[in-house]
């Protein structure tokens, strides 16, 4: 499927993993791109790659840390007119809550929650005025259950899920043509694992497959995007299982990641 020229998508966390692969997919659909990440080298590399492959599109990069909320406002002021917003930036930390670094957790909350809150609200207001646009918030299957040994990360993803569900209902009630979607992947082979200092015991999906699935479903206005059969089963498990059992399952799952 080939989209019209001059459509514009903003992707955070675009220098690697799912965000980078989403950029590749949207570039093939002739979207102009605004790519945001802390890693300037990674952004420059993907920009050069995509411009070489498609000279019809414009790509703007913003090497900035969305943990700093002023950067979120600055980004919006510089790039107001977009058609697609993908809130993908985020990271996790492993360890018992009493022992993990508080400053790193505050940074995680700012990145995983505050940046999503700010960008979703600012761009949603504009999209509602135009009565068109798509927002894709990247959460995690982790957001459907408590997460001992990654307590703060699981909590941030639960926030994103709850927020996105509520916004979707508000849009439906006002019969808006603006669509919001929620991507909840499980294990994915990305740089996330290195940052969180964990290793998945079950094979992760490739970031390319997750990105392709997510973009396809978002453009079809699918709300809950669950890539892979195991993730769909995991979501169903979370809905019928008592919290005390989910806590125990999550604890042992995290424990196995560190051996």
Locate predicted features.
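Conserved NAD(P)H cofactor-binding loop of Rossmann-fold oxidoreductase domains
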Residues: 88-93
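Residue(s) in the substrate-gating loop at a strand-loop-helix junction
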Residues: 140
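Active-site helix of classical SDR
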Residues: 120, 156
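Conserved glycine-rich cofactor-binding loop
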Residues: 15-16
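C-terminal helical subdomain
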Residues: 182, 199-235
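Conserved glycine-rich Rossmann-like NAD(P)H-binding loop of the short-chain dehydrogenase/reductase
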Residues: 29-45
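Substrate-binding pocket helix/loop in short-chain dehydrogenase/reductase
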Residues: 96-98, 104-109
């Amino acid at each position: 499927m080939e989209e019209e020229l001059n459509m514009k998508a903003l992707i955070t966390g675009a220098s690697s993993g799912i965000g980078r692969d989403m950029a590749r997919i949207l570039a093939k659909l002739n979207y102009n791109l605004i790519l945001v990440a802390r890693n300037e080298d990674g952004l420059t590399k993907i920009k050069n790659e995509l411009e070489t492959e498609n000279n019809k599109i414009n790509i703007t990069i913003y090497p900035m840390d969305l943990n700093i909320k002023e950067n979120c406002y600055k980004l919006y002021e510089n790039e107001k007119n977009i058609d697609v917003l993908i809130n993908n930036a985020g990271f996790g930390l492993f360890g018992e809550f009493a022992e993990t670094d508080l400053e790193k957790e505050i940074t995680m909350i700012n990145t995983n929650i505050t940046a999503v809150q700010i960008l979703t609200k600012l761009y949603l207001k504009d999209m509602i005025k135009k009565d068109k646009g798509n927002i894709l918030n990247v959460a995690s299957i982790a957001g459907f259950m408590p997460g001992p040994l990654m307590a703060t990360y699981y909590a941030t993803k639960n926030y994103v899920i709850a927020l996105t569900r509520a916004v979707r209902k508000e849009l439906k009630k006002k019969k808006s043509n603006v669509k919001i979607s929620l991507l909840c992947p499980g294990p994915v082979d990305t740089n996330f694992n290195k940052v969180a200092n964990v290793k998945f015991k079950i094979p992760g999906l490739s970031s390319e497959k997750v990105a392709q699935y997510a973009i396809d479903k978002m453009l079809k206005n699918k709300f809950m995007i669950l890539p892979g059969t195991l993730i769909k089963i995991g979501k169903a498990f979370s809905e019928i299982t008592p919290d005390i059992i989910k806590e125990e399952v999550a604890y042992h799952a995290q424990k196995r990641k560190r051996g």
